């Protein structure tokens, strides 16, 4: 993992240099396309550094700080709400009352956020039409099942792929769910998460 840390530090150094160049270009009133190119470079460096941070997190053991009585449906609603503000539709459907579990609230919120982002990337209509339906089902007294439907058929397992930023985050989301004693899988054009209610 040290090499990943070193790469991230190098990317951050390049970002500082690119930011310095952008300021000089802005002061010298250079053409707009040069400013745009530097902006894209900085955004790309940010994404690469973020991916490296996620890989570092994936390589470390998941340490949970569980709390009893966490309302899983509220954590999921909060994690998905930001996507509706960007125009991506995620529709929550709950077939049960509030579901409480003994979980790490913050790590579970991250996992749900990455699952929502992955669902939007893999939705049936990549052009943005159609919503992602998220259904919370209390399968038994001891576990809850959460499904993200409206996805297209994939030729790979998005939770084990590491093919790009979204898949890296889906792999980490699955690892967090598994650390809680649950599972995350892609089946029948759905993300299906099974989460125990007590640890």
List where the protein language model places each region.
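Conserved DHp (HisKA) dimerization/phosphotransfer helix of two-component histidine kinases, i.e.
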Residues: 16-17, 34-89
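Conserved phosphoacceptor histidine of two-component systems
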Residues: 1-12
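Conserved C-terminal segment of the DHp
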Residues: 13-31
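Glycine-rich/acidic phosphate-handling loop/turn and adjacent ATP-lid/helix
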Residues: 141-170
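Conserved catalytic submotifs in the C-terminal HATPase_c
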Residues: 89-99, 106, 139
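Short beta-strand/loop element within the Bergerat-fold HATPase_c
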Residues: 129-142, 149
